[in-house]
Structure formats: C-alpha cells, structure tokens
Amino acid sequence: MIRFVQYGCGKMSKYTIQYALEKGMKFVGAFDINEDIIGTTIKGVEIRPASEAEAMLKELRPDVCIVTTMSLFKDVYDILNICASLGINAITTCEEAFYPFNSAPVLADEIDKLAKKNNCTITGSGYQDAFWGNLISTLAGATDKIEKICGSSSYNVEDYGIALAQAHGAGLTLDEFEKNIASIDNISEEERKKLINKGDFLPSYMWNVNGWLCDKLGLTVTSQVQKCVPQTHSEDINSTTLNMTVKKGMATGMSAVVTT
C-alpha cells in the first residue's frame, strides 16, 4: 500500500487527499502553516506545523508527499528539497514546478540532481499537465505539419487556493496590478535572463508550459515573452478565497499572453 503525507491543507488538499484515498493509498501525515487548522484532524490524521515536516518525514518514511501550497517554485523549494534529500517522492500542484527549467533553472537543477542521487521523483502536475501539455503534444504527434500552435484557456480563480488568486492579481487595484504584476514584464531580454538565472523571475503559468512543449517536441526556443493584462468586472464580487470584496473595476484576475 502506498503511504502519503499532505503538505498544505487548504482548498486543493480536499481533493488531493480524497483522490489518493479513493485509489487505496494510506494517509499518514499532514502539515500546514495556518495556526487556525494546526492541531485539527483530516480523516483522523492530525495537522502538524510545517516546521515539523522534516523530522516527521524521517520518522514516517512515506512513499510520497503531496504538496499543495504555492504557485512559484522558490516557494515550494524547501519542502521539495527535504523530500529529495530523504529520497521521498513528491508531487506538487505548484504550476511553475511543471517545468521550472525555463524560469528557475538553478533551483530546478539542484532539486533534479538531488532527486536522482537519492532515487526519487520530484514533479509538478495538474491542469496544465493534462490539458496544456500532454493533450497538445499528443495531438501534435498525430499531425503531419505544424506551423503554429495557438491556445486559450480560462478558469475561475475562486475555485482554487489563495496562492493562485494572488498570482493572478485578483483583488488588486489596477495601479497595484500594473506595479506588482504587469510592470515586471516591461523589461529587456537581457534583464529577463538575469532574473531567470537569479531565480527572481515571475512566470505566468503558460510560460512554463510553452517551455515544456518545446522541450517535448524537440524545438529550440529562440525567444519567449509574456504580457499580463488585468481582467475586471462591472460589479462588486465577494471572494471567499481572498476573504474580501473585490470592488467594481479592481482586478478579478488576469489574461496571461505568452509568445514563444
């Protein structure tokens, strides 16, 4: 029987735990940073502080750690590094972790080498894996000639966790969106490369998928740019995910356009 622990017990964990249990896996540990839920139980398993994860992973020795916390690779690096060091498989909904090699190559290479050294798998998966990645590569494999691949996808950030909502700029004024999100892309190619090499680049979710697709299809990327455009609504919207009312005219999310 596969034994698993859950790292991050927010909205997405409700589904990952359910799916794992439905597949016959055994739930042996849970971790979070939220003081309001630490000490409570999920399916009879007590949620422990995230700070105790390393010690408990050494004790529990699960087969896999499911990580559902943040969207940026640098924000899940510590727990992935712990898992890789201990030889524990880890799978995460962190969108950048699907293909971090074109946005955080130094950190990705460190985790990759450590996982191979200790004979375990560290991977990112989720919506983009199935529908933006493998579905497209499968269709491409059955196509005689491809000149361009164009795609568009939309989803409700309210259905996901706070990390995704914040990464999309939901709840920001348009000025805040411009300063904190959109302006980050108004840089030269040289400046972008420096940010990427330092691990400070903020990729939209499609950035990593485009890199994955090019790698999968054997293509060499000569240039890649992204632009993030705020989306708004004509009326106030209450967000339980953000625990706030997103006022009329504020950003409800964004449209991320990546061209490779």
Task: Put a short name on every predicted segment.
Residues 3, 7, 11, 141-260:
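Active-site-lining helix/loop region of Rossmann-like oxidoreductase modules
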Residues 34-60:
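Conserved N-terminal Rossmann-fold NAD(P) cofactor-binding segment
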Residues 94-120:
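Rossmann-fold NAD(P)-binding glycine/threonine-rich loop
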Residues 1-26:
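NAD(P)+-binding Rossmann beta1-loop-alpha1 motif at the extreme N-terminus of oxidoreductases
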Residues 33, 70, 95-98, 127-128, ...:
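Short, ordered loop/turn segments at secondary-structure junctions
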Residues 118-147, 154:
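Adenosine-phosphate binding glycine-rich loop
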Residues 15, 22-43:
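NAD(P)-binding Rossmann-fold cofactor-contacting core
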Residues 56-64, 73-95:
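Rossmann-fold NAD(P) dinucleotide-binding segment
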